[in-house]
Amino acid sequence: MENLSPLLIEYQGLLKLIRNIKAMALNGLWDDVVEQEIVYIQSIERISQINVPANIPSTVQLQFRQLLQDILDTESQVKELLQNRMQELAVLIQQSQNQKSINNTYAEFSDDILPGKPQP
């Protein structure tokens, strides 16, 4: 049987990474989240290149299963945080567009005479 240590180390590293990404998201460090998401994807690609033996003992399978479940659960939480952030940004964009529209409307009438303004 091939040595499973490299695979186990990669999965443990992936779990640590996604937990760090979650912590960054919870702290509003969105630029860092985006940067680390790239590292996360690269880690997944690295894992996919590791040869997995056909006959893995059931105790080791259980360990991998638990790691995978933790990774997937945390990733799901990160996706939810990202979705919430996207909704917040959508609201901010809409508010910005509304403000721009209001400013443009006021600018159209800026040359008009306002009540109480002395006329030439």
Swiss-Prot record:
Q: Write down the superkingdom of origin.
A: Bacteria
Disulphide-bonded residues = none
Region annotation Required for homodimerization: where it falls in the sequence: 1-50
One Gene Ontology CC term in the entry: cytosol
Swiss-Prot/TrEMBL keywords:
Bacterial flagellum biogenesis, Chaperone, Cytoplasm, Repressor, Transcription, Transcription regulation
An example Pfam family from this entry, by short name, is FliT
Q: Extract the ranges annotated as region (FliD binding).
A: 60-98
Q: What does this protein do?
A: Dual-function protein that regulates the transcription of class 2 flagellar operons and that also acts as an export chaperone for the filament-capping protein FliD. As a transcriptional regulator, acts as an anti-FlhDC factor; it directly binds FlhC, thus inhibiting the binding of the FlhC/FlhD complex to class 2 promoters, resulting in decreased expression of class 2 flagellar operons. As a chaperone, effects FliD transition to the membrane by preventing its premature polymerization, and by directing it to the export apparatus.
Q: Which family does it belong to?
A: Belongs to the FliT family.
Protein name as annotated: Flagellar protein FliT
* Natural source organism: Dickeya chrysanthemi
Gene from which this protein is expressed? fliT
